[in-house]
Amino acid sequence: MLFKNVQVHGATGSLVTDVRVKDGMVADAGTGPDTEIIDGSGLGLVAVVPATRKDQGHMVGRVEPGIPADLLLVPRGSMPRLGTPWWRVIVGRTDLRALLTRGRVVIRDGEPLDRPANPDGARIGVWVDQNDWLHQELLPQGRYDETRGGRRHAYTGRYWLDGDRIDYLDDSGFYAFGEFIGDQLFHAEFVMRRQARP
């Protein structure tokens, strides 16, 4: 896969370049056969990289050769800042042009591609923030239902797990992300733990 003329964060600022993905990794641009070419004109590409401390999960980072191709493609004006925790990123559905996980496209032009929501069911349950204000229920069929401040069904939508990361597509039209770090779920400004089952 080749992203042509896409903006990335470089070591000395932003630049427009070509980015090649091969075997699940970001490769040197070079030349070679590409099964798919994506026009990146007007778009920006960022990487999802491990944070500097392991207990902080992942963050928005530079797209560089040799890293896993966990990539987000959005309009340039919507590019999240370097260093932003991944679980704080929110993108409008129509702005999310592509999301790649280990080089595999899982969202394209705002549409989720076929993948299992919760392959082993390990994260199913109600996750509650420290102030008991947010209750996020991850349902077995790949749906979530949030109660916020006692208001039931405040946000509802679909979710997909990818290792310790979770992708949300809200019914109201935006994507958000989260991450399981230890026994906690980080999402937006919330830190949640799974509620004990009765």
Predicted feature residues:
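Conserved, mostly hydrophobic/aromatic
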Residues: 42, 66, 103
